[in-house]
Amino acid sequence: MILGVNIRNFDVFEDDTIGLLIEDSGKYVGKSREDNGIRLRNLNALIGRNNTGKSAFIRALSYVKRSLVTDVAKASTTDNRPGFMNLLIDKNKPCEFRIFFRIRDQKTGHSEFLQYELTIGASEYGSPYIECEKVLSSVKNEDGSLLIKEVYENSSEARLISDEKVTALSVLGKLNGSESEIRQVFEEIDGWFFCAFSAEESSDYYSAGNAPGAHKHLNSDGSNVGNVLDYIKSLGEGEYESLMNEINSKIPALRKKKKNLPLNLQGSPEKLFKYLLLLRDPHPKTTIFIETPDRDLYHDMVDVLADDMREFTLNHPYSQIIFSTHNPYIVEAMSPKEIWVFSRDFEDNDDAVRIRCAGSDPVVMALFEQGVGMGAIWYGGHLDQGSSEYDEDGVNNAH
């Protein structure tokens, strides 16, 4: 799972961090996993007004995965991206991504803390190339302090991969002889799933590359749901019936209510069905990214989805969900430490993105500890003000 991300000079992000990076991890030595400060958690909500960077954050991480699956040049023009130079804020500087993970070691079962760093520069012709890649490991010493060691570095001066557009991680991560940390980071990013069930325009089934027959996993827009159900049915009629009964029992008055819903909500039961099916995949994704999963869902369906997302993260402690929303209902039962507020001052010349954790605001924490739900706190305007920022110790860091 992702503990933190830093993005520099890419899209709307000049130098912005969400969560915890490896260089700051030493301050949390000795604390329990549930209480180790302001970091991304198993369930995370991105909130804020329109055009504040929530969708851009998800798109930026989609770009990282696409760079690994294909290469940095193709990633810059697929998924409606406008080309690499148009993704840079400062055309004379590279963009950089730093992503800090907590990953389960498949052999020992223990947590590994690893950071992947990717720097992409532009040639004189504006085409992207890999300037530097690193994998760092955070290791606890006998005295309890943390040692940060470099597992791998691939720079333009000492490249192992001849194609400068291809990431070394995408090659070495598939080799059994590579360092285990490299394979773990690759598998973690390769397991990201960018869910578009609630997208305003879904891809056509065949143009999305689907084929008839049984499919093990849902695709990004859920258009192959029938194929996935065929696969589950092939495993055994009893297993199929059990899954269908469980999911259908969670969808409120599925057939009755649908007749009386407004037109834009009549697809809600099917949309909720896809989410519930995704969350029951026996081989869960490492991180599921969803933009506005509550879009067009009836309010009681939002409650069902929120409960099931929570249950997913409890059942899969090394997986996580990161979603954006404008709906207070879906965050009502969440913790302030699971909510990230994006803001921008459009009256300022640089209209820079600012990201803060709701759990770093002592006023919000006090309200939450008194029993006020996060949806009510948000509806009351306590999350949108953004007039001051606090660190986890309650120190005001506003400039």
Describe each region flagged by the PLM.
Residues 107-250:
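Electropositive, glycine-dotted interaction segments
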Residues 1-67, 257-399:
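Switch/communication elements of ASCE P-loop NTPase nucleotide-binding domains
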Residues 95-97, 190-191, 335-338:
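Short glycine-/polar-rich loops that comprise or flank the Walker A/P-loop
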Residues 39-43, 49, 56-123:
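Conserved P-loop NTP-binding catalytic core
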Residues 253:
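Oxyanion-binding "anion nests"
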Residues 5, 97-99, 127-139, 259-260, ...:
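Short polybasic amphipathic segments
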Residues 7-9, 99-108, 137-139, 346:
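Short acidic, glycine-rich loop/turn motifs
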Residues 3, 16, 97-99, 114-116, ...:
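Hydrophobic residues positioned within well-ordered beta-strands of beta-sheet architectures
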